[in-house]
């Protein structure tokens, strides 16, 4: 697919793997956000950003959102009738299409998805962004420093609930946190491919 780029932030590998699969399917490049330059965005009509979820935030999404903020505001103004299609065309934004993917081990839980959207897309102009939730993998033995501390705290919070408050999802999460998990699945990128090729 011409003029498409997949930008990602990956710490343990799942986001990079999904980015590579998406790029392969779309016939484009995948590049880490550290290697990508903001000024190069103008060369692409379709931009996909993805990153792992940590403490409710999508890694480096704030940096990416700063890059595309003016585009999103213009698209929002167009959708709300504040500017015309001609105005949008003049801005060079009219054909640009963005999508976001988040990778984590608790993203099949609808409440977790909503929290993620609330935390990462607080402004009205951000809410238009399609966001896809992809299952990652987790290996507790690989964690160090702050990552280990965050996961230990999350585990303590769940285990600290009263027995009657612990949900089935909490039990699954405790198992993942204690034993690790490998949930990564290439088939889960299909909705992203469909979104970017429609």
Map each language-model feature to its residues.
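Short, Lys/Arg-enriched, disordered terminal segments
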Residues: 1-3, 197-198
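Short loop/helix-cap segments at secondary-structure boundaries that form the rim of catalytic
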Residues: 23, 38-43, 126
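FMN-binding flavodoxin-like domain, especially the glycine-rich phosphate-binding loop
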Residues: 56-198
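Structural motif
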Residues: 45-48, 97
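A short, well-structured beta->alpha microelement
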Residues: 27-39
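N-terminal beta1-alpha1 ligand-phosphate binding loop
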Residues: 3-25
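Short glycine-/small-residue-rich Rossmann-like dinucleotide-binding loops
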Residues: 52-53
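Hydrophobic anchor at the start of a short beta-strand
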Residues: 4, 28-31, 98, 129
